[in-house]
Amino acid sequence: MHKLYSLKKAKKILIATNNPGKFIELKEILPKKIKFYKPKDFNLKEPIESGKTFKANAKIKSSYAAKRTGLISISDDSGLEVDALNKKPGILSARWAGPTKNFNIAIKKIYNLLKKKNRLNSKARFVCAISVALSDGSTFEYQGKIEGSLSFPPKGKKGFGYDPIFVPKGYSKTFAQISKIEKNRISHRFKAFIQIKKFFKFS
């Protein structure tokens, strides 16, 4: 784990995502003194996510970005697992939103599938795998999750993706209804990232 100590002195980090919501969340979790870059700053195309797990896909994205930019690159692969749908959409969460990334389409699809099963309040969880890739090819993956249940109709406008239908365990509001500060404190993304902070004390 000693190689990741270089993160402590990192001045530039590429957040390898084209999802504005994910970029903002990761940026808010990371130290403020670092200059952050997006894939479009380097005209990077999205690599093909051929992995079978969240960790595998996160690694594909971070490795691709680090290799082509020479910067420490952080990527995440996350998704919603719905128990009543055998943990689908899972790693296909973004694809369910279609090429335009319209999550209203994905949410409607989940609603229709659950309605047929009479399981609209199915238990579910958000899973996030974060991968850190160094310019020497080393990668490190961490995973976090938050349990909860689904709620229809969608509620709230503060989140993105499936946030409007996900109620974290112990809460009565959806991710899209609670504040960014509160969401960042309990989110699957934060739980994955906090594992990096255990090893690397950002100053």
Spans of features found by a protein language model:
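Anionic-ligand binding patches
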Residues: 2-16, 20-203
